[in-house]
Protein backbone atom coordinates (compact mmCIF):
# COMPACT_ATOMS: atom_id res chain seq x y z
CA UNK A 1 0.00 0.00 0.00
CA UNK A 2 1.55 3.28 -1.14
CA UNK A 3 2.00 6.45 0.86
CA UNK A 4 -0.05 9.55 0.01
CA UNK A 5 1.97 12.78 0.09
CA UNK A 6 -0.31 15.81 0.18
CA UNK A 7 1.40 19.15 -0.47
CA UNK A 8 -0.99 21.81 0.85
CA UNK A 9 0.31 25.14 -0.42
CA UNK A 10 -0.70 28.51 0.99
CA UNK A 11 -3.86 29.41 2.88
CA UNK A 12 -6.17 27.68 0.40
CA UNK A 13 -4.11 24.50 0.47
CA UNK A 14 -4.29 24.52 4.27
CA UNK A 15 -8.04 25.10 4.12
CA UNK A 16 -8.47 22.08 1.84
CA UNK A 17 -6.26 20.00 4.16
CA UNK A 18 -8.60 20.95 6.99
CA UNK A 19 -11.53 19.38 5.10
CA UNK A 20 -9.40 16.34 4.30
CA UNK A 21 -8.78 15.89 8.03
CA UNK A 22 -12.53 16.01 8.70
CA UNK A 23 -13.00 13.27 6.12
CA UNK A 24 -10.15 11.25 7.64
CA UNK A 25 -11.68 11.53 11.12
CA UNK A 26 -15.02 10.33 9.80
CA UNK A 27 -13.53 7.20 8.25
CA UNK A 28 -12.39 8.20 4.76
CA UNK A 29 -9.02 6.98 3.45
CA UNK A 30 -9.33 3.70 5.43
CA UNK A 31 -5.94 2.31 6.41
CA UNK A 32 -4.12 4.79 4.18
CA UNK A 33 -0.86 6.41 5.19
CA UNK A 34 -1.35 10.15 4.72
CA UNK A 35 1.69 12.45 4.81
CA UNK A 36 0.59 16.10 4.81
CA UNK A 37 3.19 18.75 4.00
CA UNK A 38 2.15 22.37 4.51
CA UNK A 39 4.11 25.02 2.63
CA UNK A 40 3.60 28.73 3.17
CA UNK A 41 5.86 31.75 2.96
CA UNK A 42 3.69 33.44 5.59
CA UNK A 43 4.65 32.12 9.02
CA UNK A 44 1.52 33.61 10.62
CA UNK A 45 -1.08 32.64 8.02
CA UNK A 46 -4.34 32.02 9.89
CA UNK A 47 -5.57 29.07 7.81
CA UNK A 48 -2.19 27.36 8.01
CA UNK A 49 -1.96 27.67 11.80
CA UNK A 50 -5.57 26.50 12.19
CA UNK A 51 -4.81 23.36 10.19
CA UNK A 52 -1.54 22.74 12.04
CA UNK A 53 -3.51 22.75 15.31
CA UNK A 54 -6.03 20.29 13.85
CA UNK A 55 -3.22 18.02 12.66
CA UNK A 56 -1.82 18.03 16.18
CA UNK A 57 -5.18 17.00 17.68
CA UNK A 58 -5.67 14.22 15.14
CA UNK A 59 -2.14 12.95 15.71
CA UNK A 60 -2.60 12.87 19.48
CA UNK A 61 -5.82 10.87 19.17
CA UNK A 62 -4.17 8.51 16.69
CA UNK A 63 -1.12 7.96 18.90
CA UNK A 64 -3.29 7.08 21.89
CA UNK A 65 -5.62 4.84 19.90
CA UNK A 66 -3.31 3.31 17.33
CA UNK A 67 -5.29 0.07 17.17
CA UNK A 68 -8.12 1.76 15.32
CA UNK A 69 -5.84 2.12 12.30
CA UNK A 70 -6.05 -1.63 11.79
CA UNK A 71 -9.83 -1.52 11.47
CA UNK A 72 -11.49 -1.71 8.07
CA UNK A 73 -13.78 1.16 8.99
CA UNK A 74 -14.38 3.62 11.75
CA UNK A 75 -13.30 6.97 13.08
CA UNK A 76 -9.67 8.12 13.00
CA UNK A 77 -8.54 5.02 11.13
CA UNK A 78 -6.26 6.81 8.64
CA UNK A 79 -2.62 6.91 9.61
CA UNK A 80 -1.22 10.43 9.78
CA UNK A 81 2.56 10.53 9.30
CA UNK A 82 4.83 13.42 10.23
CA UNK A 83 7.72 13.15 7.77
CA UNK A 84 9.62 15.91 9.60
CA UNK A 85 9.19 14.32 13.04
CA UNK A 86 8.63 17.83 14.40
CA UNK A 87 5.57 19.15 12.58
CA UNK A 88 3.86 19.02 9.20
CA UNK A 89 5.17 22.32 7.91
CA UNK A 90 8.27 23.01 5.86
CA UNK A 91 9.37 25.49 8.49
CA UNK A 92 12.37 26.70 6.53
CA UNK A 93 10.08 28.57 4.12
CA UNK A 94 8.98 31.18 6.64
CA UNK A 95 12.13 31.03 8.79
CA UNK A 96 14.51 31.86 5.95
CA UNK A 97 12.29 34.72 4.82
CA UNK A 98 11.79 36.24 8.27
CA UNK A 99 12.32 40.01 8.18
CA UNK A 100 13.38 39.90 4.55
CA UNK A 101 12.01 42.12 1.82
CA UNK A 102 11.55 40.92 -1.72
CA UNK A 103 14.34 43.29 -2.68
CA UNK A 104 16.70 41.39 -0.34
CA UNK A 105 15.99 38.16 -2.19
CA UNK A 106 16.24 39.69 -5.65
CA UNK A 107 19.59 41.27 -4.79
CA UNK A 108 19.45 43.03 -8.11
CA UNK A 109 22.24 45.44 -7.17
CA UNK A 110 24.59 42.44 -7.30
CA UNK A 111 23.79 41.44 -10.88
CA UNK A 112 26.98 40.80 -12.81
CA UNK A 113 25.66 42.44 -15.95
CA UNK A 114 24.85 46.08 -16.54
CA UNK A 115 23.59 46.88 -13.04
CA UNK A 116 21.95 50.15 -14.03
CA UNK A 117 20.12 48.54 -16.95
CA UNK A 118 18.76 45.61 -14.91
CA UNK A 119 17.90 47.81 -11.96
CA UNK A 120 15.71 49.90 -14.24
CA UNK A 121 14.09 46.76 -15.67
CA UNK A 122 13.17 45.35 -12.26
CA UNK A 123 12.01 48.73 -11.00
CA UNK A 124 9.73 49.05 -14.02
CA UNK A 125 8.24 45.61 -13.37
CA UNK A 126 7.61 45.85 -9.65
CA UNK A 127 8.13 49.33 -8.28
CA UNK A 128 9.37 50.40 -4.86
CA UNK A 129 6.37 49.25 -2.80
CA UNK A 130 6.38 45.70 -4.15
CA UNK A 131 10.16 45.31 -3.88
CA UNK A 132 10.11 46.41 -0.26
CA UNK A 133 7.07 44.34 0.68
CA UNK A 134 7.57 41.70 3.38
CA UNK A 135 8.53 38.42 1.73
CA UNK A 136 6.53 36.35 4.22
CA UNK A 137 3.27 37.89 2.97
CA UNK A 138 1.65 36.35 -0.06
CA UNK A 139 -1.73 37.83 -1.00
CA UNK A 140 -0.46 40.99 -2.68
CA UNK A 141 -1.86 42.39 -5.94
CA UNK A 142 1.17 43.13 -8.12
CA UNK A 143 3.89 41.08 -6.48
CA UNK A 144 1.83 38.08 -7.57
CA UNK A 145 3.65 34.89 -8.49
CA UNK A 146 6.72 36.52 -10.08
CA UNK A 147 8.41 37.64 -6.89
CA UNK A 148 6.83 34.86 -4.83
CA UNK A 149 8.48 32.28 -7.08
CA UNK A 150 11.84 33.91 -6.41
CA UNK A 151 11.10 33.67 -2.68
CA UNK A 152 10.02 30.03 -2.99
CA UNK A 153 13.10 29.10 -4.98
CA UNK A 154 15.19 30.80 -2.31
CA UNK A 155 13.50 28.91 0.54
CA UNK A 156 12.94 25.48 -1.07
CA UNK A 157 16.36 25.02 -2.62
CA UNK A 158 18.13 22.20 -0.84
CA UNK A 159 15.14 21.52 1.44
CA UNK A 160 15.52 18.14 3.12
CA UNK A 161 11.86 17.20 2.66
CA UNK A 162 12.40 16.17 -0.96
CA UNK A 163 15.44 14.08 -0.04
CA UNK A 164 13.35 12.29 2.58
CA UNK A 165 10.72 11.48 -0.03
CA UNK A 166 13.44 10.20 -2.37
CA UNK A 167 14.89 7.95 0.32
CA UNK A 168 11.55 6.31 1.16
CA UNK A 169 9.80 6.43 -2.22
CA UNK A 170 7.93 3.34 -3.44
CA UNK A 171 6.49 2.83 -6.95
CA UNK A 172 2.90 3.00 -5.67
CA UNK A 173 3.33 6.25 -3.71
CA UNK A 174 1.21 9.23 -4.77
CA UNK A 175 1.98 12.95 -4.81
CA UNK A 176 -1.00 15.32 -4.62
CA UNK A 177 -0.38 19.07 -4.78
CA UNK A 178 -3.12 21.51 -3.75
CA UNK A 179 -3.12 25.28 -4.11
CA UNK A 180 -5.08 28.26 -5.35
CA UNK A 181 -4.75 29.97 -8.71
CA UNK A 182 -5.30 33.42 -7.23
CA UNK A 183 -2.87 33.80 -4.31
CA UNK A 184 0.82 34.36 -4.92
CA UNK A 185 1.77 31.54 -2.56
CA UNK A 186 -0.41 28.98 -4.33
CA UNK A 187 0.68 29.89 -7.84
CA UNK A 188 4.36 30.15 -7.03
CA UNK A 189 4.38 27.14 -4.73
CA UNK A 190 2.73 24.79 -7.22
CA UNK A 191 5.32 25.70 -9.87
CA UNK A 192 8.33 25.43 -7.58
CA UNK A 193 7.25 22.13 -6.00
CA UNK A 194 6.76 20.66 -9.48
CA UNK A 195 10.19 21.99 -10.45
CA UNK A 196 11.69 20.17 -7.48
CA UNK A 197 10.12 16.89 -8.60
CA UNK A 198 11.25 17.48 -12.19
CA UNK A 199 14.84 17.82 -11.01
CA UNK A 200 14.84 14.57 -9.02
CA UNK A 201 15.25 11.48 -11.16
CA UNK A 202 14.17 9.04 -8.44
CA UNK A 203 10.77 10.76 -8.16
CA UNK A 204 9.99 10.99 -11.87
CA UNK A 205 7.96 7.77 -11.90
CA UNK A 206 5.61 8.63 -9.01
CA UNK A 207 1.96 9.41 -9.70
CA UNK A 208 1.38 13.16 -9.44
CA UNK A 209 -1.89 15.08 -9.39
CA UNK A 210 -2.47 18.81 -9.03
CA UNK A 211 -5.71 20.24 -7.61
CA UNK A 212 -6.17 23.88 -8.63
CA UNK A 213 -8.72 25.90 -6.64
CA UNK A 214 -9.95 28.83 -8.71
CA UNK A 215 -11.33 32.06 -7.15
CA UNK A 216 -14.47 31.26 -5.18
CA UNK A 217 -15.02 34.58 -3.41
CA UNK A 218 -14.89 38.31 -4.08
CA UNK A 219 -12.57 40.83 -2.46
CA UNK A 220 -12.73 44.60 -2.21
CA UNK A 221 -11.64 45.77 -5.67
CA UNK A 222 -10.56 49.13 -4.30
CA UNK A 223 -7.94 47.36 -2.19
CA UNK A 224 -7.02 44.51 -4.47
CA UNK A 225 -8.18 45.33 -7.98
CA UNK A 226 -9.11 43.37 -11.09
CA UNK A 227 -5.82 41.39 -11.33
CA UNK A 228 -7.27 39.03 -8.70
CA UNK A 229 -9.21 37.23 -11.45
CA UNK A 230 -7.11 38.10 -14.47
CA UNK A 231 -3.99 36.70 -12.84
CA UNK A 232 -5.87 33.47 -12.07
CA UNK A 233 -6.79 33.00 -15.72
CA UNK A 234 -3.27 33.83 -16.83
CA UNK A 235 -1.77 31.39 -14.34
CA UNK A 236 -4.03 28.54 -15.45
CA UNK A 237 -2.98 29.13 -19.05
CA UNK A 238 0.68 29.26 -18.01
CA UNK A 239 0.35 26.11 -15.91
CA UNK A 240 -1.16 24.07 -18.74
CA UNK A 241 1.50 25.24 -21.19
CA UNK A 242 4.48 24.58 -18.91
CA UNK A 243 3.55 22.02 -16.25
CA UNK A 244 0.46 19.97 -17.06
CA UNK A 245 2.44 17.48 -19.15
CA UNK A 246 4.69 16.72 -16.16
CA UNK A 247 1.80 15.42 -14.00
CA UNK A 248 -0.61 12.53 -14.43
CA UNK A 249 -3.78 14.50 -13.76
CA UNK A 250 -4.92 18.06 -13.14
CA UNK A 251 -8.22 18.91 -11.44
CA UNK A 252 -9.67 22.43 -11.51
CA UNK A 253 -12.18 23.38 -8.81
CA UNK A 254 -14.51 26.03 -10.21
CA UNK A 255 -17.47 27.74 -8.61
CA UNK A 256 -19.43 30.95 -8.73
CA UNK A 257 -18.01 33.87 -6.76
CA UNK A 258 -20.93 35.13 -4.69
CA UNK A 259 -19.36 35.93 -1.31
CA UNK A 260 -17.24 38.88 -0.25
CA UNK A 261 -14.32 38.24 2.07
CA UNK A 262 -12.35 41.03 3.73
CA UNK A 263 -8.98 41.71 2.12
CA UNK A 264 -5.93 40.69 4.16
CA UNK A 265 -2.44 40.55 2.68
CA UNK A 266 -1.40 37.83 5.12
CA UNK A 267 -0.82 37.03 8.77
CA UNK A 268 -3.24 35.82 11.42
CA UNK A 269 -6.15 37.75 9.89
CA UNK A 270 -5.99 35.74 6.67
CA UNK A 271 -8.22 32.88 7.77
CA UNK A 272 -10.96 32.09 5.26
CA UNK A 273 -13.83 29.87 6.42
CA UNK A 274 -14.59 26.41 5.04
CA UNK A 275 -16.42 26.58 1.74
CA UNK A 276 -18.00 24.17 -0.70
CA UNK A 277 -15.09 24.86 -3.09
CA UNK A 278 -12.46 23.73 -0.59
CA UNK A 279 -14.64 20.76 0.38
CA UNK A 280 -14.92 19.78 -3.29
CA UNK A 281 -11.15 19.89 -3.52
CA UNK A 282 -10.95 17.56 -0.50
CA UNK A 283 -13.50 15.19 -2.08
CA UNK A 284 -11.43 15.24 -5.26
CA UNK A 285 -8.35 14.16 -3.30
CA UNK A 286 -10.38 11.39 -1.69
CA UNK A 287 -11.61 10.22 -5.09
CA UNK A 288 -8.06 10.23 -6.51
CA UNK A 289 -6.83 8.07 -3.63
CA UNK A 290 -9.81 5.71 -3.68
CA UNK A 291 -9.34 5.11 -7.41
CA UNK A 292 -5.54 4.79 -7.23
CA UNK A 293 -5.08 7.73 -9.57
CA UNK A 294 -7.47 6.39 -12.21
CA UNK A 295 -10.13 9.01 -11.53
CA UNK A 296 -11.42 10.80 -14.60
CA UNK A 297 -11.87 14.55 -14.54
CA UNK A 298 -14.42 15.68 -11.98
CA UNK A 299 -16.26 18.74 -13.26
CA UNK A 300 -18.74 20.42 -10.94
CA UNK A 301 -20.30 23.07 -13.14
CA UNK A 302 -22.05 26.10 -11.69
CA UNK A 303 -25.54 24.80 -12.43
CA UNK A 304 -24.95 21.97 -9.97
CA UNK A 305 -23.79 24.11 -7.07
CA UNK A 306 -26.91 23.51 -5.01
CA UNK A 307 -27.49 19.88 -5.88
CA UNK A 308 -27.07 17.21 -3.23
CA UNK A 309 -27.22 14.67 -6.06
CA UNK A 310 -23.81 15.83 -7.27
CA UNK A 311 -22.17 13.65 -4.64
CA UNK A 312 -23.88 10.53 -5.90
CA UNK A 313 -23.64 11.38 -9.59
CA UNK A 314 -19.88 11.62 -9.43
CA UNK A 315 -19.43 8.51 -7.32
CA UNK A 316 -18.54 10.42 -4.17
CA UNK A 317 -21.57 9.44 -2.15
CA UNK A 318 -19.85 6.70 -0.17
CA UNK A 319 -18.37 9.23 2.24
CA UNK A 320 -21.86 10.40 3.22
CA UNK A 321 -22.29 7.52 5.63
CA UNK A 322 -18.89 8.14 7.17
CA UNK A 323 -19.72 11.80 7.67
CA UNK A 324 -23.02 10.86 9.25
CA UNK A 325 -21.36 8.47 11.72
CA UNK A 326 -18.92 11.11 12.77
CA UNK A 327 -21.56 13.85 12.89
CA UNK A 328 -23.63 11.69 15.24
CA UNK A 329 -20.54 11.00 17.36
CA UNK A 330 -19.70 14.68 17.63
CA UNK A 331 -23.23 15.72 18.46
CA UNK A 332 -23.71 13.05 21.09
CA UNK A 333 -20.25 13.58 22.57
CA UNK A 334 -21.18 17.13 23.49
CA UNK A 335 -24.45 15.94 24.96
CA UNK A 336 -22.65 13.24 26.92
CA UNK A 337 -20.42 15.81 28.55
CA UNK A 338 -23.55 17.16 30.21
CA UNK A 339 -24.68 13.76 31.41
CA UNK A 340 -23.28 11.31 33.96
CA UNK A 341 -24.88 8.16 32.57
CA UNK A 342 -21.52 6.85 31.40
CA UNK A 343 -19.85 7.20 34.81
CA UNK A 344 -19.59 3.41 35.02
CA UNK A 345 -17.74 3.43 31.69
CA UNK A 346 -15.29 6.03 32.97
CA UNK A 347 -14.77 4.28 36.28
CA UNK A 348 -14.26 0.86 34.73
CA UNK A 349 -11.80 2.11 32.13
CA UNK A 350 -10.15 4.51 34.58
CA UNK A 351 -10.55 7.26 32.05
CA UNK A 352 -10.98 10.25 34.33
CA UNK A 353 -7.29 10.97 34.80
CA UNK A 354 -6.13 9.80 31.38
CA UNK A 355 -8.67 11.35 29.07
CA UNK A 356 -9.04 14.67 30.82
CA UNK A 357 -5.32 15.25 30.47
CA UNK A 358 -4.65 13.76 27.04
CA UNK A 359 -6.96 12.09 24.57
CA UNK A 360 -10.15 13.56 26.00
CA UNK A 361 -8.83 17.09 25.49
CA UNK A 362 -7.66 16.35 21.94
CA UNK A 363 -10.94 14.70 20.96
CA UNK A 364 -13.00 17.47 22.55
CA UNK A 365 -10.93 20.04 20.65
CA UNK A 366 -11.37 18.12 17.40
CA UNK A 367 -15.14 17.83 17.92
CA UNK A 368 -15.39 21.58 18.45
CA UNK A 369 -13.37 22.16 15.27
CA UNK A 370 -15.63 19.75 13.39
CA UNK A 371 -18.73 21.61 14.51
CA UNK A 372 -17.13 24.93 13.55
CA UNK A 373 -16.29 23.49 10.13
CA UNK A 374 -19.90 22.34 9.63
CA UNK A 375 -21.24 25.75 10.64
CA UNK A 376 -18.90 27.50 8.21
CA UNK A 377 -20.02 25.20 5.41
CA UNK A 378 -23.66 25.95 6.16
CA UNK A 379 -23.02 29.70 5.83
CA UNK A 380 -21.56 29.36 2.36
CA UNK A 381 -23.80 30.85 -0.29
CA UNK A 382 -22.76 28.08 -2.66
CA UNK A 383 -23.53 24.62 -1.36
CA UNK A 384 -22.48 21.19 -2.46
CA UNK A 385 -24.90 20.26 0.27
CA UNK A 386 -26.19 22.02 3.36
CA UNK A 387 -25.00 20.91 6.79
CA UNK A 388 -28.45 21.33 8.22
CA UNK A 389 -31.03 18.90 9.52
CA UNK A 390 -32.79 18.18 6.23
CA UNK A 391 -29.81 17.72 3.93
CA UNK A 392 -27.66 15.89 6.49
CA UNK A 393 -30.64 13.60 6.80
CA UNK A 394 -30.68 13.16 3.00
CA UNK A 395 -26.96 12.41 2.98
CA UNK A 396 -27.38 9.71 5.60
CA UNK A 397 -30.34 7.92 4.10
CA UNK A 398 -30.11 8.74 0.41
CA UNK A 399 -33.59 9.47 -0.90
CA UNK A 400 -35.50 8.33 2.17
CA UNK A 401 -36.98 11.18 4.19
CA UNK A 402 -37.38 11.43 7.95
CA UNK A 403 -40.13 13.93 8.85
CA UNK A 404 -38.87 17.05 10.60
CA UNK A 405 -35.24 16.19 9.86
CA UNK A 406 -32.42 14.49 11.67
CA UNK A 407 -32.12 17.03 14.47
CA UNK A 408 -35.64 16.18 15.63
CA UNK A 409 -34.36 12.67 16.34
CA UNK A 410 -31.51 14.15 18.34
CA UNK A 411 -34.02 16.03 20.44
CA UNK A 412 -36.21 12.99 20.84
CA UNK A 413 -35.20 9.38 21.21
CA UNK A 414 -31.78 9.44 19.57
CA UNK A 415 -29.90 10.52 22.67
CA UNK A 416 -31.51 7.71 24.65
CA UNK A 417 -30.71 5.25 21.85
CA UNK A 418 -27.11 6.40 21.86
CA UNK A 419 -26.84 6.06 25.62
CA UNK A 420 -28.22 2.54 25.41
CA UNK A 421 -25.87 1.64 22.56
CA UNK A 422 -22.90 3.21 24.32
CA UNK A 423 -23.61 1.15 27.42
CA UNK A 424 -24.28 -1.99 25.38
CA UNK A 425 -21.04 -1.56 23.43
CA UNK A 426 -19.18 -0.94 26.66
CA UNK A 427 -20.52 -4.12 28.25
CA UNK A 428 -19.68 -6.17 25.13
CA UNK A 429 -16.15 -4.84 24.90
CA UNK A 430 -15.47 -4.96 28.60
CA UNK A 431 -16.61 -8.57 29.00
CA UNK A 432 -14.62 -9.69 25.95
CA UNK A 433 -11.29 -10.90 27.34
CA UNK A 434 -9.38 -10.07 24.16
CA UNK A 435 -10.82 -6.59 23.76
CA UNK A 436 -10.58 -5.74 27.44
CA UNK A 437 -6.80 -5.94 27.15
CA UNK A 438 -6.77 -2.88 24.89
CA UNK A 439 -5.49 0.38 26.39
CA UNK A 440 -8.31 2.37 27.96
CA UNK A 441 -8.12 5.20 25.43
CA UNK A 442 -8.31 2.80 22.49
CA UNK A 443 -11.29 0.97 23.98
CA UNK A 444 -12.99 4.33 24.52
CA UNK A 445 -12.87 5.13 20.80
CA UNK A 446 -13.92 1.63 19.83
CA UNK A 447 -17.01 2.08 22.00
CA UNK A 448 -17.77 5.48 20.48
CA UNK A 449 -17.35 4.12 16.96
CA UNK A 450 -19.51 1.06 17.58
CA UNK A 451 -22.31 3.05 19.19
CA UNK A 452 -22.26 5.71 16.44
CA UNK A 453 -22.57 3.12 13.68
CA UNK A 454 -25.47 1.44 15.45
CA UNK A 455 -27.30 4.74 15.88
CA UNK A 456 -26.76 5.72 12.24
CA UNK A 457 -28.10 2.33 11.16
CA UNK A 458 -31.07 2.87 13.47
CA UNK A 459 -31.80 6.12 11.61
CA UNK A 460 -31.52 4.43 8.22
CA UNK A 461 -33.82 1.57 9.17
CA UNK A 462 -36.37 3.66 11.06
Each model region followed by its residue ranges:
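Beta-strand elements within well-structured catalytic alpha/beta cores of enzymes
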Residues: 174-178
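Terminal, contiguous helix-loop blocks that mediate binding/assembly
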Residues: 1-25, 29-173, 193, 202-462
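Short Gly/Thr/Asp-enriched flexible loops that form oxyanion-binding sites at enzyme active sites
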Residues: 20-21, 185-197
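Gly/Ser/Thr-rich loops at beta-strand to alpha-helix junctions
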Residues: 9-15, 179-190
Amino acid sequence: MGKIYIFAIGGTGANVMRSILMLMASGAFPQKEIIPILIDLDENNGNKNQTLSLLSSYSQIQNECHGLINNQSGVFNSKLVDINNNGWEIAECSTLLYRKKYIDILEYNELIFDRYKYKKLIDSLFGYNEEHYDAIHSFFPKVDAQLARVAFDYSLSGNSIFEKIEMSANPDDMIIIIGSTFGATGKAGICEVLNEFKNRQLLQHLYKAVVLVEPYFEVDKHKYGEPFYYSSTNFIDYYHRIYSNSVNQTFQIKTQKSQYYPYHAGGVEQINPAHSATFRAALTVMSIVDNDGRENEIDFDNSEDCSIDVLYRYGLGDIAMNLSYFAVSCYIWQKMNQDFFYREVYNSLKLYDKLKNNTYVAFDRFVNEYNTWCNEMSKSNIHLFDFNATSLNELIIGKKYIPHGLISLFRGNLLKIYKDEMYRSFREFYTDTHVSNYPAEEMFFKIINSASMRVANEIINS
